[in-house]
């Protein structure tokens, strides 16, 4: 199976009715976890999991998401289906999802100013270089299910056969993907909130 990437942008505020409709489509434990969130973070999370539900329906024929569990550092996964792997990320108005049959990690960041101190710490020549490096590191942490605290030390230890790349899915955004698979990446599927609701 090729690596499938989905993106939602912009994430607009959801009405209470829209949020409740998306919450109702989630497995019980995930619904409870997200019900306590408010505002933009809640809206991005609800859209991300609805995008995941649609992707799983497209690729595996699932009508509903199975229970979602979370690793020690927050990596979501399906405990009942190890061959359906995914990674979610959201940043300031955009959501990115990767679906694959092997472990995968994604990260998306909106380009924004970064202090000279941080750029120096990570040996980045400018903000764009900093964020490109950041999303690649973060996607590795997400694939491996380790804490992003590993990023503070600079280098993320290399893993044999791991493939990492960055791309710009949207103006002023950069995304990173990390996988140990040799499969190619399919075309980025762009969605809107209206298409999800």
Give the residues covered by each predicted segment.
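Core catalytic alpha/beta fold that binds nucleotide/phospho-ligands
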Residues: 1-197
């Amino acid at each position: 199976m090729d690596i499938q990437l989905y993106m939602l942008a912009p994430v607009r505020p959801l009405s209470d009715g829209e949020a409740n409709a998306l919450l109702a489509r989630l497995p019980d434990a995930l619904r409870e976890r997200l019900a306590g969130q408010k505002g933009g973070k809640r809206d991005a999370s609800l859209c991300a999991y609805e995008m995941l539900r649609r992707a799983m329906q497209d690729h595996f024929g699932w009508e509903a998401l199975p229970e979602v569990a979370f690793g020690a550092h927050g990596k979501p996964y399906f405990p009942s289906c190890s061959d359906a792997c995914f990674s979610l990320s959201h940043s300031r108005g955009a959501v990115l999802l990767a679906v694959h049959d092997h472990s995968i990690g994604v990260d998306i960041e909106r380009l924004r100013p970064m202090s000279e101190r941080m750029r120096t710490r990570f040996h980045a020549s400018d903000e764009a270089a900093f964020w490109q490096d950041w999303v690649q590191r973060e996607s590795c942490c997400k694939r491996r299910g380790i804490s992003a605290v590993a990023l503070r030390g600079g280098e993320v230890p290399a893993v044999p056969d791991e493939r990492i790349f960055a791309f710009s899915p949207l103006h002023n955004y950069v995304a990173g993907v990390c996988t140990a698979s040799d499969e190619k990446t399919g075309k980025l599927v762009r969605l809107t909130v209206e298409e999800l609701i």
